[in-house]
Amino acid sequence: MNVQWYPGHMTKAKRQMQEDLKLIDLIIELVDARVPLSSRNPDIDQLGQNKSRLILLNKADLADERQNEAWKEYFQKRGFYVVKVDSRNGSGMKTIQNVIQEACKEKIERDRRRGIKNRPIRAMVAGIPNVGKSTFINTFAGKACAKTGNRPGVTKGKQWIRLNKNVELLDTPGILWPKFEDQKVGLRLALIGSIRDEILNTDELAVELIRFLKTQYPGILTERYEVEETQKETELLCGIAENRKCITKGGELDYSKAAALLIDEFRSGKLGKVTLEWPKEQENG
């Protein structure tokens, strides 16, 4: 399954980000806790080499808590500050202010030595499409100051948001790389909804999800759909269609409808708390 998505405006956004980096002290990078590495932009590490870094594991409530902790440790080992959040219900938000101060303590001390008082920390909020940047800013700032939507690429333009006397946020459009070198990355991003569904083969996507769940979360499909997990992936999809009565007008099983239902129930968390990539895979190379 070949997945690619890189609209032209993303190239412009990357150039804009390079300019904006000159203005900021800290990069706050949102990743999806279900796919923390795949939902990172590989350009950000290179572009932000000399900046303080904070990674927010967003939608942590939808992810496997054991893996949340493992990913937190993974990134901390690599020099990042890390906070688990859910920008929709505000979970973890109170922690962020203190972590921002901690991440920028060298900048604050440098200002103090120069006699500069009360200069706010300027932070860039970055992340790939549909990872929850605008919702995070709305929740963090306490008002709907950034346009939100659940379709990739909805956030446009540049906005400075003054949170308080200590912190100003710059919202930037998410950036997705031009080509997925590893097709597993594209697959994972497609499953969490960071790539437009119109350009995807939903049936193939569902089969790949079933294959992963059978291996890493045995029993989860049986519990939800009363199917036998020893079956092949396509047979399991058939069983899900039967369980949920996904039938065409002609009376046949509607595999595409069942596939869409499975993916939707994964994305919404109805299937259970699932993380699609685990840090031990990265440690093992």
Residue ranges and their predicted role:
Residues M1-I27, A33-D43, L47-R53, A60, ...:
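Helix-rich effector regions associated with P-loop NTPase G domains
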Residues D61-A126, C145:
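Canonical P-loop GTPase G-domain recognition
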Residues T95, V99, T135, E208, ...:
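Alpha-helical scaffold segments in soluble metabolic enzymes
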Residues S87, I137, V167-L170:
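Conserved active-site beta-strand-loop modules that form the wall/rim of enzyme catalytic pockets
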